[in-house]
């Protein structure tokens, strides 16, 4: 009985592996040079909206202290 269960598990695992490989084989692929050029273009187009590059205006910064510390 144990041998039959192990065999069934192996078959199920093999089917899952084949299904995964078929899915991965159907994915459209592009060359790294094209992907990197597209990524650089996207970054350049959206750089003006990136708060890490442009900074956040102090009037819109929700984390900036509204008042100074009175203890010091």
UniProtKB/Swiss-Prot annotation:
PROSITE patterns hit by this protein: G_PROTEIN_GAMMA
GO MF: G-protein beta-subunit binding; PDZ domain binding
Modified residues (Cysteine methyl ester): 69
Pro-peptide region(s): 70-72
Subunit structure: G proteins are composed of 3 units, alpha, beta and gamma.
Pfam families in the record: G-gamma
UniProt key word Acetylation: yes
One BP term from GO: G protein-coupled receptor signaling pathway
Bilayer disposition of the protein: Lipid-anchor
GO cellular component, one term: heterotrimeric G-protein complex
Name of the molecule in the record: Guanine nucleotide-binding protein G(I)/G(S)/G(O) subunit gamma-12
Species this chain originates from: Bos taurus
Function recorded in the entry: Guanine nucleotide-binding proteins (G proteins) are involved as a modulator or transducer in various transmembrane signaling systems. The beta and gamma chains are required for the GTPase activity, for replacement of GDP by GTP, and for G protein-effector interaction.
Residue numbers of Phosphotyrosine PTMs: 42
Gene behind the chain: GNG12
Assigned protein family: Belongs to the G protein gamma family.
Lipid-substituted positions (S-geranylgeranyl cysteine): 69
């Amino acid at each position: 009985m144990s041998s039959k269960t192990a065999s069934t598990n192996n078959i199920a695992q093999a089917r899952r592996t084949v299904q995964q490989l078929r899915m991965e084989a159907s994915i459209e692929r592009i060359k790294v040079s094209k992907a990197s050029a597209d990524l650089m273009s996207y970054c350049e187009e959206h750089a003006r909206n990136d708060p890490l590059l442009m900074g956040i205006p102090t009037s819109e910064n929700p984390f900036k202290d509204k008042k100074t510390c009175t203890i010091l």
